[in-house]
Amino acid sequence: MKRRIVFAGDSIIHGGPWQYWLPEHYVTNFGFPGHTTSDLEGLVPNIVESLPELLIVMIGTNDFGKYRLTEDEVVTNILSVADEIRRLMPDVPIIWNSLSPRSDEFSQSMIEVNARIKPVLEDLGIIYFDTFAILKDPNRNIIEIKYCEDPDTFGLHLNNAGYNHWFKALSPQIQIELDLIQD
């Protein structure tokens, strides 16, 4: 059965070929380059109106890079938007991707934020998906070069190999959630 799957977040979500990977479903992509947690909060009414049967989110990396927010501010913002989404869509399964690895400059902050949001998201009934662990270099807490679109700067954008690796890890969780949906 065709399901409505909504992706929401920043450029990392925006760049994913979700409809290609999920052709048997209706896919809406609310991923926008440069978006922050505040931007996503502004899109919540649109997300709700799209009537998702499954919501997949990744947001927060631009809060560090674009606005230089503190870890506390990023945690507060992520949890605020997660709480609002959960309140407005109490029965919709949500998969929340952790912040993904970037450069050395941000990696420790990403790890700290991920550790702090995970238990709260789980308490909200949101599935926490550890994208950081999937995309990080095995020897350092940065994005693995072979998954990086901009390897000279250890940037945050994924290349095709990065998206494929992420989706291969994410797709079983997507399928689990889709299988649990009751008509």
Language-model segment annotations:
Residues 1-80, 103-111, 115:
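Conserved SGNH/GDSL esterase-like catalytic core that processes O-acyl groups on lipids
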Residues 48, 86-87, 118-121:
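N-terminal cationic-hydrophobic initiation segments that often serve targeting/anchoring roles
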Residues 58, 97-98:
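Alpha/beta-hydrolase-fold catalytic nucleophile elbow
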Residues 81-85:
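Hydrophobic positions in alpha-helices of CheY-like receiver
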Residues 89-93:
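A short helix->loop->beta-strand "cap" motif at the edges of active sites that frequently abuts
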Residues 103-183:
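Catalytic His-Asp segment of secreted/periplasmic serine-dependent ester chemistry enzymes
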